[in-house]
Amino acid sequence: MRDRGRIHVRGIVQGVGFRPFVYARARALGIRGSVKNTGSQVEINAWGDRFETFLAEVSRGPPLARIDSVEVLPLGGS
């Protein structure tokens, strides 16, 4: 199981409360990291014991978002 990753979320993810949604889910699950808008996507660097649960919730997004794709890349560290 992964415990960290760099997540790129593409679709309608800006202006729909996506970053506050990510923050709330991360806080609730004890996930650490960062989230930022980068052009037409949101980039999340995240790590923690419940990373897979966090990834599943982020992949669904908040109600106003439309997720077209989610890509998970390795995030350095152990």
Language-model segments: residues:
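Intrinsically disordered, low-complexity, mixed-charge
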Residues: M1-S78
